[in-house]
Every structure is written in structure tokens, then in C-alpha cells.
Amino acid sequence: MAACGKTNKSHVIFKKVSRDKSVTIYLGKRDYVDHVSQVEPVDGVVLVDPELVKGKKVYVTLTCAFRYGQEDIDVMGLTFRRDLYFSRVQVYPPVGAMSVLTQLQESLLKKLGDNTYPFLLTFPDYLPCSVMLQPAPQDVGKSCGVDFEVKAFASDITDPEEDKIPKKSSVRLLIRKVQHAPPEMGPQPSAEASWQFFMSDKPLNLSVSLSKEIYFHGEPIPVTVTVTNNTDKVVKKIKVSVEQIANVVLYSSDYYVKPVASEETQEKVQPNSTLTKTLVLVPLLANNRERRGIALDGKIKHEDTNLASSTIIKEGIDRTVMGILVSYHIKVKLTVSGFLGELTSSEVATEVPFRLMHPQPEDPAKESVQDENLVFEEFARQNLKDTGENTEGKKDEDAGQDE
């Protein structure tokens, strides 16, 4: 008789093997959440082949780097990369007292057996999140942005330089540092504006409101617009846009303001009348893939990502080391008839800020990591909701490890 009961959820483990098979790194996830007050540490294990390592030491490093764009900028005498953070731990042979193992590490040590060594890498609170500026379709090379890399390698040099690490004995993994929506929302965003036109005794009033402060990626954003036209002019068009503001603060304080979604109505507001209209926008990367300079959440290789999430900065942190700061606002623009009626026009606009983020993930403390439910997957990005596309990753049940 088949056993009854609740089936435990499989826990995907991401692994990568060096070319010479001497070291294999295992991570329980690829996205590490910045809770503002603290950041989830990178916990994992390294499987070492003592025969292939042959007395070398095995290290694991965590690097945060800001890339300025295409690498050919180096010919101008400038560096195209700046390391914002670097840390390294020796995992083999073990040094010092072993720290308390996480539940994930306990399960991996039990499953993988001897020659498996745990490591724990932490993020300081001043680092930016993973973000990049989307290149144009014809651009080649690495994109401008912030990325994080975990690397495991074997070396017989105590303090090896990057170019002296044997590539065949090293393995690199890109991970992401991400932020999710805070548990509590701020006040409901709204804005009011008035304009006085020449030869009009009374103003044109505009009121804009959103239903909440934070919207999740892929969620429709209803924007309620009320136009009170006390002038003798005609409001010919109402256009509502979601604009993304990417502030590259690390090297030049450049601002990139890009509309990522828009809707408009041609319904006119005649003199001495009022119109209330709700327009719904859905900002998606799927509708902006060809546009250079759009900020995206950092991605790994050529897999899916989404529009960059709004940046939350911990109080007291220096903004200039945050790489790229991302924010959003709703812009409402009115086209108003001019002196010659329909033949000419002028435009007025106002803005309402909001946040675009991912929801809080399930509490990891509620998930139990059981060694019999571990599923090993070659390191590759998973699909995200924002893109409007669906791709499947390749999973490897790794039957050979079940013994």
C-alpha cells in the first residue's frame, strides 16, 4: 500500500564544476535578499577531489563589481570595471573552528559525503543591488551595471592574483543581490497641480491619484486623473506614462529618464467642465526589449530578468557607492489648445512617485531542507514573471549522488 501524507517540496541546488573536476561548488539559491537592515548570507559547500587538488588550497571569494560598459573603454586609459567589495575564505584545508552549519549545509554534507567543505560569505550593508542598463541590440560586450560573483578555485599560491588563478581549477557563478517590497506600504500617492493661462481668469486644475504606493512587477497600475477645466481653453488629450529614472551615481551622476509604459485618451475636456478618467498601465520589460538605457534587475548570462526594482537605501549609507539608483513615477501630461484654438497647443504635466518591486518571498524558515528532496541543477537563470515569456531550465536529478 502506498504511503499517505504530504509530499515534501523538492529543494533545487545549483552546482557548477571546474573544467578539471577538482572543485565543485553548490549553492541553495541564486538570489540573496537585501532586507535593508541586513542581507542574507551566501551559504554553500565545495566538493574537493584531493587527488586532483594535490596539496593546493581551495578558496571561495565574493566580489561586487561595477562595470562601466563595453570593455573597449580601456583603450582610452580608463578602467572599465571597479571592484566595490571583495572577500575570500579558505575552505580546504579547513582553518580555525568550524562555524555553525546552516540547514542547507547539513543536508549537502550528508548527501555529498567526505571531502565536502562548507563556506559562508556575507554582504556589507553599503553595497548596491544587482542592476544593469540594457544595451542596444547592436551593442556587444558587457553591459553597464552592478554584478556579484562567487568563485571557487584551487591554488598553490597563498595570495594569488586574479591572472594567476588556474582557469581549469576555478569555477565562477553570478548571483544577484535583490530587494523586495517592505512589509508595510507608505501613504497613498497623489498630486495636485494648477496652471494659470494668459487671458484666463481661472486655472486649469489636475488631480492624480494611485491606489497604493507599491506595485509588483507585472501588476496593472490604475491611475485616476481628474481634470477641472475652469479656463476658456480645451484640454485636447490626456497622456499617462510610467517613467523610470536611473541615476548612475558612481562615476558621473548621469540621469536616464525612460518611459516604460503609456496610455492616453483623446476625450476632450471642454471649457468650464470636469472629467475623471482611470487609465491602466502595465510596465513590462517585454515591451521595452529594444530600448537602450532601460535599467533592469541584474541578470545572469542571457536568461530572463525584469525591469529594475525601485532602490531602497539604508539610512546613513553613502549614495555615491550605490552604483545605479532606480525610481519610478507616473507622469500625467495634458495637451491644451493655444491662442489659435485647434491649430496650436501647449503642454502641462505633473508627476506622482511610486515603487515597483517584487513581493516578499516565502519565509525561508518555513521551508525544510531534506537531503532526500535535493534536486541538482546546472547553474542557469530561472524565468521571471515580468518578461511575459516562459522558458524552462535544465534539471539534473543527479542519480549518481543518491547513493
From Swiss-Prot:
- Localization, UniProt: Cell projection, Cilium, Photoreceptor outer segment; Membrane
Q: Mark the residues carrying the PTM Phosphothreonine.
A: T231
GO MF annotations in UniProt: opsin binding; phosphoprotein binding; spectrin binding
* Residue ranges of the region described as Interaction with RHO: 11-19
Query: What are the disulfide bonds?
Result: none
Please indicate if the UniProt record lists RNA-binding as a keyword: no
Question: What topology in the membrane does the UniProt record assign?
Answer: Peripheral membrane protein
Keywords linked to the UniProt accession: Cell projection, Membrane, Phosphoprotein
Provide the assembly information.
Monomer. Homodimer. Homotetramer. Interacts with RHO (via the phosphorylated C-terminus).
Family note:
Belongs to the arrestin family.
Instruction: Name the chain's protein.
Output: S-arrestin
According to its UniProt entry, this protein's organism is Mus musculus (Mouse)
Q: What is this organism's lineage? A: Eukaryota, Metazoa, Chordata, Craniata, Vertebrata
